[in-house]
């Protein structure tokens, strides 16, 4: 525990947060007491495998997003990686751009002396961003789509030493079109490995590739993530080109769980046991320490007749963290760790992933069947048919077909029970807490891989009434 306390101690110079005089209506995503401690903008890094997504995040934030043993060994991202970074701008108007922009880790002070020779200015904190590092492997497409659900903007990475587009590049671009992401920066990475003429050629390829897509007209920035070349230019673009997304702090708080874990070590004394921790992205509202919360669908059970019952979990927030920064309240943006009093066995090994956490009695319904209006891609992305330059055609949805459905941060199986025109009914393998108007992504199994085939919007469905135990809140 001492190390954790020491790490929190590093934050002496961060702005203090005080719950007693918190006025939510006056909060903005750029309030000093908010951006001092937590990120308020989510930026996804997307692109083909091994094009340098995680390296770019490390160059900006200093954080290695590849954390798990099997990821490190294979040098690929499997789970969603998160890293927060503070972006500063020198307050001396004579400090030339782009050197007047710099980035550092989330736990650093809000003001730093300018590093340029003979500059008397100070770097002031202007943005606090969270990078959602998505996997580029086609097999991990579901994880990528879960990431797309929480992004405000995207960095599309294209390696300079390979032809453009690579299969996952086009698949990811389709995914961010589904999620209606408008803010995109294109990074031409590994520029140190190629000649200038190659870089110009590839620049033409990239502009041609993004024509007619959501990324058309997006700035293309040449960088080298390994050598940290042009990272200051990227910081300048993030500040000037990506607007701060509008947030509704007065809405009921809602967090989609992307990770959950049990922080207790084996052999821990019963008196020292800590409750489970849920990590996720807040979509709306403000979560506060001491607040009573509900997690839906909660504990899902099936009886011998196949009937599903859901028991929402009730608890209280005991702590909030953004990386190593302790919070009194958390707003949308970045990955927030929520320490609760939930039985840790319910949280261990990502058991709560795909669930929704929020204020008691203010969460949406739990759906077992969804009625959607859907749109299919014309061709499969990243799958070539023999002798054909274009992708394989996407077949229509068949009755009783099994698809992979992505709703928020949940990936679950779904069986098509009926289809007519562009409408379909899907019976889900696991119930989901969602609402009408939400977007979902549909993937089909092709050649042993789940491939994105289209998306849909929920307009109805069959809900489950949750079972509430007699003692509603476990305090």
Swiss-Prot record:
Major location category of this protein: cytoplasm
Any single GO BP term: cytoplasmic translational initiation
Residue runs in coiled coils: none
Residues annotated to bind GTP: 50-55, 189-192, 224-226
Organism: Drosophila melanogaster (Fruit fly)
Subcellular location: Cytoplasm, Cytosol
Chain positions covered by the region annotation G4: 189-192
Region entry Interacts with CDC123, spans: 456-468
Gene behind this protein: eIF2gamma
InterPro entries documented for this protein: EFTu-like_2 (IPR004161), eIF2G (IPR050543), eIF2g_C (IPR015256), eIF2g_dom_2 (IPR044127), eIF2g_GTP-bd (IPR044128), P-loop_NTPase (IPR027417), T_Tr_GTP-bd_dom (IPR000795), Transl_B-barrel_sf (IPR009000)
CDD domains with a match to the protein in the record: eIF2_gamma, eIF2_gamma_II, eIF2_gamma_III
Gene Ontology CC: one annotated term: eukaryotic translation initiation factor 2 complex
Pfam families found in the cross-reference section: eIF2_C, GTP_EFTU, GTP_EFTU_D2
Highest taxon of the lineage: Eukaryota
Start and end residues of each stretch annotated as G3: 133-136
Function: As a subunit of eukaryotic initiation factor 2 eIF2, involved in the early steps of protein synthesis. In the presence of GTP, eIF-2 forms a ternary complex with initiator tRNA Met-tRNAi and then recruits the 40S ribosomal complex and initiation factors eIF-1, eIF-1A and eIF-3 to form the 43S pre-initiation complex (43S PIC), a step that determines the rate of protein translation. The 43S PIC binds to mRNA and scans downstream to the initiation codon, where it forms a 48S initiation complex by codon-anticodon base pairing.
Domain tr-type G: 38-247
Region G5, annotated ranges: 224-226
GO MF annotation terms: GTP binding; GTPase activity; methionyl-initiator methionine tRNA binding; translation initiation factor activity
Name this protein carries in UniProt: Eukaryotic translation initiation factor 2 subunit 3
Organism placement in taxonomy: Eukaryota, Metazoa, Ecdysozoa, Arthropoda, Hexapoda
Subunit-structure text: Eukaryotic translation initiation factor 2 eIF2 is a heterotrimeric complex composed of an alpha, a beta and a gamma subunit. The factors eIF-1, eIF-2, eIF-3, TIF5/eIF-5 and methionyl-tRNAi form a multifactor complex (MFC) that may bind to the 40S ribosome.
Keywords (A to Z) from UniProt: Cytoplasm, GTP-binding, Hydrolase, Initiation factor, Nucleotide-binding, Protein biosynthesis
Catalytic activity: GTP + H2O = GDP + phosphate + H(+)
Enzyme Commission number(s) from the entry: 3.6.5.3
Keyword Magnesium recorded: no
Region entry G1, spans: 47-54
